[in-house]
Design a protein with these regions (language model features):
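Cytosolic covalent-transfer regions centered on His/Cys nucleophiles
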Residues: 1-155
Length: 155
């Protein structure tokens, strides 16, 4: 796998009218599923199951919703910037405006899932990376910034 970044998985100004995590996860699932209702429902269920274990609110206005889904052909990475802050039960108690999403095949715990999460966590702890990410003004800038900054993930 060369890169996990795909242009069609960068979402800007995602509407979350209620400002609640449940609706945000539903919106992310809908956008990522691209009109595949069965896949959308799997994503929603997988994200909710993970959130029931612990919040994926990373802190600093960022969440890393992630899940594993059996039978998934390849890992999915998405970036969603919300139209308003979302209450997420983050570790710092602050609402979330950016969600960095990782979904991997259920069989890929050691091979792909953990390396992707570790790489994302390292990048998101870098204040300069996050500041420049937030400075992107549209979907195109977000895409090219992420493409340039995220290293390839070895499958």
């Amino acid at each position: 796998m060369d890169t996990i970044v795909r242009r069609d998985m960068i979402f800007d100004n995602v509407q979350v009218c209620s400002g609640q995590k449940r609706e945000a996860l539903r919106a992310i699932s809908h956008l990522c599923a691209k009109d595949d209702m069965a896949y959308e429902l799997k994503l929603i269920a997988a994200f909710r199951e993970r959130e029931a274990l612990y919040s994926t609110g990373f802190g600093g206005g960022i969440a890393i919703p992630h899940a594993r889904i059996n039978g998934l052909a390849e890992p999915l990475f998405a970036l969603a910037r919300f139209d308003r802050p979302v209450e997420w039960d983050a570790i710092d108690g602050k609402p979330v405006d950016l969600a960095v999403v990782a979904v991997t095949p259920g069989e890929a715990e050691r091979d792909i899932h953990l390396p992707i999460l570790a790489m994302l966590a390292r990048k998101l702890m870098d204040e300069n990376f996050v500041r420049r990410l937030r400075a992107c003004t549209d979907k195109t800038q977000l895409y090219y910034y992420m493409l340039r900054e995220l290293p390839p993930v070895k499958a």
